[in-house]
Amino acid sequence: KEITPDYMGFEVITPDLPEKMYAGMIIGYQVSPMLGIKMDWLTEITQVKELEFFIDEQRIGPYTIWHHQHHLSPLENGVYMKDIITYQPPLGFLGAMANGLIINRKLKEIFSYRKNILEKRFGIFDPNQSRK
């Protein structure tokens, strides 16, 4: 929640999540991606390799397809994070138009916000820093 812009109204609604993530874990959210309209979003953690990566996929939500890879690499002074997202908006041609006009730009804005928050909290990635 802390790494998502406030205007998204992002809230985890699944109670009592375990400390450790596991494949098959279902997480429910409420999010307001457009015009403050709340919608449910349900994702499943489909793969986890502890301290290396995890993948979440949408089961219910705003996209036809949402596949989000979170990669982690230890560094001397922290952790390098990389997100790889594959998505498809709903509504065929109309969704493709909305993607070109709004959705893609919004996603870039959201992940830029996330990157800025993480850099403020943990420091800026130095590509010359060696990975462990």
Each predicted region: which residue ranges?
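Short, highly charged C-terminal tails/helix-capping segments
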Residues: 12-18, 119-132
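A short, structured loop/turn motif at beta-sheet edges
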Residues: 18-22, 46-53, 71-80
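Short beta-strand segments that buttress and anchor functional surface loops
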Residues: 25-33, 55-61
